[in-house]
Each structure stands twice: as C-alpha cells, then as structure tokens.
Amino acid sequence: MKLTCVVIVAVLLLTACQLITADDSRGTQKHRSLRSTTKVSKAADCIEAGNYCGPTVMKLCCGFCSPYSKICMNYPKN
C-alpha cells in the first residue's frame, strides 16, 4: 500500500513537471524557418536508387546501400 502511494505521487509529480515545462517553452523557438530548410536540404542530399554507394562516396543513399553490389536501393514496400 505504501509503495503504491509513492508510485502515484511520483507519477503525479512527473506529470506536473512536464506540463509546467511545456507551458513555459511555448513560442520560444527562434529562427523556425531556418531550421526547417536545413532539414529539407539534408533529406534531399542523398544518392538515388541505382547509383554506386561504395566507401568512396560521401553521400548516403536515399534508401539503403546493398552490401554486396554497392548499389543504392529503395526500401521494399509492404
């Protein structure tokens, strides 16, 4: 019974801390447009499927690099 009360109090305390932190940080992100453009440019900077992706290539594949043929491949669709 004592352990249950301690767990309940701990969960309530952690929930309250998260809510306080979420309210406090609202609207404080600066340079929002700059951050989104860097994410897009990083996502588009990859090797397309069918191209060589060996150890001398500096870019990553958009999908995955086949370990045997060293050719970029798309992920299979389920």
Swiss-Prot record:
It comes from the Eukaryota. Keywords: Calcium channel impairing toxin, Disulfide bond, Ion channel impairing toxin, Knottin, Neurotoxin, Presynaptic neurotoxin, Secreted, Signal, Toxin, Voltage-gated calcium channel impairing toxin. The presence of a 'disulfide through disulfide knot' structurally defines this protein as a knottin. The cysteine framework is VI/VII (C-C-CC-C-C). GO terms for molecular function: calcium channel regulator activity; ion channel inhibitor activity; toxin activity. InterPro entries: Conotoxin, Conotoxin_omega-typ_CS. Omega-conotoxins act at presynaptic membranes, they bind and block voltage-gated calcium channels (Cav). One of its GO terms (cellular component) is extracellular region. The keyword Signal applies. This is Omega-conotoxin-like 2. It comes from Conus striatus (Striated cone). It is found in: Secreted. Residues 23-42 form a propeptide. Disulfide bonds join C46-C62, C53-C65, C61-C72. The lineage of its organism: Eukaryota, Metazoa, Spiralia, Lophotrochozoa, Mollusca. Residues 1-22 form the signal peptide. Expressed by the venom duct. The keyword Kinase does not apply. Belongs to the conotoxin O1 superfamily. Its main location: secreted.
